[in-house]
Amino acid sequence: MSYKIDRNTYAQTYGPTTGDRVRLADTELFIEVEKDLTTYGDEVKFGGGKVIRDGMGQSQVTREDGAVDTVITNALIMDWWGIIKADVGIKDGKIFEIGKAGNPDIQDNVDIVIGASTEVIAGEGHILTAGAIDTHIHFICPQQIETALASGITTMLGGGTGPATGTNATTCTPGSFHISRMLQSAEAFPMNLGFFGKGNSTNGRNLIDQVEAGACGLKLHEDWGTTPSTINSCLNVADKFDVQVCIHTDTLNEAGFVEDTIKAIAGRTIHTFHTEGAGGGHAPDIIKICGEKNVLPSSTNPTRPYTTNTLEEHLDMLMVCHHLDSKIPEDIAFAESRIRRETIAAEDILHDMGAFSIIASDSQAMGRVGEVITRTFQTAHKMKLQRGPLSQDSDRNDNYRVKRYISKVTINPAIAHGINKYVGSIEKGKIADLVFWKPSFFAVKPELVVKGGSIVWSQMGDANASIPTPGPVHGRPMFANFGQSLINSSFTFLSKNSIDQNIPKKLGLQKNCIAVENTRSINKSHLKLNSKLPNISVDPETYEVFSDGELLTCEPLNEVPMAQRYFLL
């Protein structure tokens, strides 16, 4: 006779199952398990008197014959493609399978074979997401990387050379010398890294040199002169070498207006940074570019979400980052032209509509590198409060909204930069960059981070304690942070041309180097759950934003979740 167990006891033992709902941190967002790939009564769980023992849940199968290196049991997977309960197998640092783990000799429908060579990570009661991807990094200081990793980010793309004045303002690693040194520096960090060259040159040879040196993309920034001619020159090189172009457009409209930039882009694929405009771009109407099919629009996190403090903090940040002088009236006017309540409010709604597709940090250059995931889900929470459930959702759950927002920091930046074959989602064959969250700490503080199949970061107690849990408990680097494990668990993204020219070997790189690919044939329709193309207009006098004739506006929040409740210092 089968044993019956109530839902609450089952969830406490094996994690939530189909139909169970989970609250995300202290937000008003709730997810509901859509499907459970484990088998009731045949679940695997590790521990004394539990299932994963020799001859029971652990088989006699060797690693060579198919046993996985690591199994994650009973995890609640949250990804763009679904919110499901499953076991996850990892082998050779990659996701081997998502399904049912166990011993095929005594259990049915086993997709993931557990053997003596298999380690176990208990996923019960945890949300599992893909490692997040931040595509707007100013590499100002190396300490950013640990901060980002501790927040759940496992891939960082951007530019810079350290705290140089140019890097403080722009995400460019200019020239082959600096690109080479940054690629060599990347060897030291447990993070997937890639670097953008400076895209501002009408002489294509300057751009080609950087791509050949290993740049995985090119960045056009107004502080270096983003004119129609440099835009065209940069995109010509990108099309030839299959790298992405990121753009920060001309706030002052000196070389033309947003229409002139759209004309210069000429239908070619481009990733627009801080597309609302507070981070920079044609004032006041750069936001309308999100309606172009070839444009992959992103936000940076200082304007995420719109709160009562958003406008006040921006002016000083902007003056510092862009090397402006508060004694010069023109510099003050430049800064003030970028900070508009109306467009920031509209940005919230455009994200909720799926018209803005990506969220990144703008690290130490107005943005906060450790708050990308937090700010993303604060925005989702705000929009639920102010706009109610999406049409695809119900009063029971916010699954579609949550999948839309997780896509903005995982799969969509991966697609935009040609690395989605390797990272950006929990799918068979991809690198096992995975983040575990307690639901009460979701999007705030990860419980554990797996990098290339090995544990790289975890909440950990006193190392001198008799068990792992006594305080002080805080995030600490784990073994994949060190030595050759670091080298083999993390990756560097370069242009295909540079790999073909043996640049990794010439520079003495030990990390596995991966070529970006398919950056030029994509458009917004390829971005998951965030491909809406609204017809945007901006009133030049009031800065009010309209989508297909409808005013987009919302009020700022006085209080956000995932904030002081979690950060006491």
From Swiss-Prot:
Keywords: Cytoplasm, Hydrolase, Metal-binding, Nickel. It is an enzyme of class 3 (hydrolase). Its main location: cytoplasm. GO terms for biological process: urea catabolic process. Its EC number is 3.5.1.5. The active site is at 322 (proton donor). Pathway: Nitrogen metabolism; urea degradation; CO(2) and NH(3) from urea (urease route): step 1/1. Substrate binds at residue 221. Ni(2+) 1 binds at residues 136, 138, 219, 362. It holds the Pfam family Urease_alpha. Residues 131-569 form the Urease domain. Its cofactor is Ni cation. CDD domains: Urease_alpha. PANTHER family: UREASE. Belongs to the metallo-dependent hydrolases superfamily. Urease alpha subunit family. Heterotrimer of UreA (gamma), UreB (beta) and UreC (alpha) subunits. Three heterotrimers associate to form the active enzyme. This is Urease subunit alpha. It comes from Prochlorococcus marinus (strain MIT 9312).
